[in-house]
């Protein structure tokens, strides 16, 4: 081939000033260069070095995989690699959807459950103090008026429910009912989220005793021994008169209020719920009555506050079962009634009942009336204790709380009497939904006691925190925790005691990362909200589905249909 000279190359160059192919009228549209195309044409770049080759990353796949994964993506508008598509900052081509649809379906059920307990919880005293007539807790009667903790709709088609899909993890799956019906004439004053409550702090002293009532039996140490598998201890029904009277109906608190002993009055059950509120999940409510410069923390009759919850803090908490389902005994309301029944009978069973060996308090039981009660009183000591919640000396604020002790025991070393609180954890079915990954107590309680307790701390954080707070403010030396399981996981009317473990309350609180200073700060904050407002009645409500507390101002006659909270008002009218 003859060589080409430089002059020939220069002469072959186009003579126009512009570079590139010459523009003709056939390739222009209104004078603008235009290339006709259809949306079915394959469009791409001259050289795209960022795309994968036809052989794939690992050299395998071949032409068929190339056509399926690469070539067809270049169709106009077909994928993210189109020239006309918006290029995102992050590549989402590798995103995949994982279905979280569950096979089992749950539907809403009609409320029902275990028939336990002797009548209603709470009660009211005589209008002028004294013993009056009080309703008892525990026993065998029916418990009425209990609101279900979890009242979700159906899940998955059987009752009009819907299937779960993408991002359902981010949607509320359990819509619980509020513990009290919010009426239109209630005025919301404050809304506090739990994050704000967790930052509160108030240091206070250990408190001082004002007076004590009742008596205590000695604790039966044989329950501390590990039972033989062939001879497990059965949980027996022990009928004893026990009371859970609200604050304003307590004749002793009425007398202390008339003497201006304190600004705030409460019971240990109500106070512990308020102090441990950031750990709560289920709904609850506290009635707050401001009378003059005094604040009474009360509860309603049949309130969920008195029920012992089960696995409230578990990641997969117990759910409602369908009507007629075999899992109906494992729904939240039935488990709560079962746990309340177990705690009442367990505390009575572990006592050595002997009139010659018991510790008498300074005064008799203020709620027991031998002329009306057929059952003997339960081993119970009521200590009225006073705490200083003042921020400075110029503005003193004190709190009087009625605390409870369950038993007394001799110290193994010094031989001195130690005061005990007795509670019970219950196992329903380690394999059922809502068990929270709990271990089998029958096989693991002895060999892996630490793991069993750690799991209970996780699944029942609020319940254990409340028991610990009640033990500390009562100045109990030891908190006994019994481990009670069903004799048959499918039946909730027979139980066995698998063991009892004792802790010092403050040591147990440190293991749970429980701060009493935070609890006292919450109490002082809520009380200050009521003290800065006018006299009247307020209700503190835990939102059933959100970690929020709401303070409502309610009419003065609210809840009086239930026969409660009118004791103070009647006393004031008589004084006038």
UniProtKB/Swiss-Prot annotation:
Its main location: cytoplasm. Residues 165-176 have a biased composition (Basic and acidic residues). Residues 103-176 are annotated as: Disordered. It is found in: Cytoplasm. One of its GO terms (biological process) is cap-dependent translational initiation. It comes from the Eukaryota. Residues 110-122 have a biased composition (Gly residues). Keywords: Cytoplasm, Initiation factor, Protein biosynthesis, RNA-binding. Residues 304-318 are annotated as: RNA gate. The RNA gate region regulates mRNA cap recognition to prevent promiscuous mRNA-binding before assembly of eif3d into the full eukaryotic translation initiation factor 3 (eIF-3) complex. Belongs to the eIF-3 subunit D family. Component of the eukaryotic translation initiation factor 3 (eIF-3) complex. mRNA cap-binding component of the eukaryotic translation initiation factor 3 (eIF-3) complex, which is involved in protein synthesis of a specialized repertoire of mRNAs and, together with other initiation factors, stimulates binding of mRNA and methionyl-tRNAi to the 40S ribosome. The eIF-3 complex specifically targets and initiates translation of a subset of mRNAs involved in cell proliferation. In the eIF-3 complex, eif3d specifically recognizes and binds the 7-methylguanosine cap of a subset of mRNAs. This is Eukaryotic translation initiation factor 3 subunit D. It comes from Botryotinia fuckeliana (strain B05.10) (Noble rot fungus).
């Amino acid at each position: 081939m003859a060589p080409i000279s430089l002059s020939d190359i220069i002469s072959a160059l186009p003579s126009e000033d512009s570079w590139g192919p010459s523009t003709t009228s056939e390739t222009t549209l209104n004078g603008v260069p235009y290339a006709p195309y259809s949306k079915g044409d394959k469009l791409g770049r001259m050289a795209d070095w960022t795309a994968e080759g036809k052989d794939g990353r690992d050299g395998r796949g071949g032409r068929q995989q190339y056509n399926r994964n690469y070539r067809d993506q270049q169709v106009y508008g077909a994928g993210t690699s189109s020239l006309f598509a918006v290029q995102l900052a992050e590549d989402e081509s590798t995103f995949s959807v994982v279905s979280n649809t569950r096979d089992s379906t749950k539907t809403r059920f009609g409320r029902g459950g275990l028939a336990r307990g002797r009548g209603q919880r709470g009660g009211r005293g005589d209008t002028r103090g004294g013993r009056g007539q009080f309703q008892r807790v525990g026993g065998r009667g029916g418990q009425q008026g209990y609101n279900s903790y979890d009242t979700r709709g159906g899940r998955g088609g059987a009752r009009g429910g819907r299937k779960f899909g993408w991002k359902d993890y981010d949607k509320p799956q359990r819509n619980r009912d509020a513990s009290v019906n919010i009426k239109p004439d209630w005025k919301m004053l404050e809304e506090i989220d739990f994050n704000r409550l967790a930052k509160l702090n108030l240091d206070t002293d250990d408190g001082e005793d004002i007076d004590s009532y009742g008596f205590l039996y000695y604790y039966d140490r044989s329950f501390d021994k590990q039972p033989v598998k062939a001879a497990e201890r059965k949980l027996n029904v022990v009928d004893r008169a026990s009371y859970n009277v609200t604050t304003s109906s307590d004749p002793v608190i009425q007398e202390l209020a008339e003497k201006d002993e304190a600004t705030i009055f409460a019971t240990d059950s109500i106070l512990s719920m308020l102090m441990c509120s950031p750990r709560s999940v289920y709904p609850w409510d506290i009635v707050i009555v401001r009378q003059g410069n005094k604040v009474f923390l009360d509860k309603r009759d049949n309130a969920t506050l008195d029920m012992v919850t089960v696995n409230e803090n578990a990641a997969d908490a117990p759910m409602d079962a369908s009507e007629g389902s075999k899992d109906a005994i494992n729904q939240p309301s039935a488990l709560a009634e079962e746990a309340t029944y177990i705690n009442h009978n367990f505390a009575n069973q572990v006592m050595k009942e002997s009139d010659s060996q018991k510790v008498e308090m300074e005064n008799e039981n203020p709620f027991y009336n031998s002329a009306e009660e057929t059952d003997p009183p339960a081993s119970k000591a009521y200590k009225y204790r006073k705490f200083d919640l003042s921020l400075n000396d110029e503005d003193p604020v004190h709190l009087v709380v009625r605390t409870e002790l369950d038993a007394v025991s001799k110290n193994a070393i010094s031989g001195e009497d130690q005061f005990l609180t007795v509670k019970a954890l219950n196992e329903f079915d380690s394999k059922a939904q809502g068990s929270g990954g709990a271990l089998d107590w029958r096989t693991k309680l002895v060999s892996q006691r630490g793991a069993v307790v750690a799991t209970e701390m996780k699944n029942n954080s609020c319940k254990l925190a409340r028991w610990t707070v009640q033990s500390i403010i009562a100045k109990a030396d030891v908190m006994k925790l019994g481990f009670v399981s069903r004799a048959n996981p499918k039946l909730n009317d027979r139980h066995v005691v698998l063991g009892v473990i004792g802790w010092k309350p403050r040591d147990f609180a440190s293991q749970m990362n429980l701060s009493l200073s935070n609890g006292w700060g919450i109490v002082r904050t809520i009380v200050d909200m009521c003290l800065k407002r006018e006299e009247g009645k307020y209700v503190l409500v835990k939102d059933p589905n959100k970690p929020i507390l709401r303070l409502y101002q309610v009419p003065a006659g609210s809840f009086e249909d239930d026969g409660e909270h009118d004791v103070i008002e009647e006393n004031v009218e008589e004084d006038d």
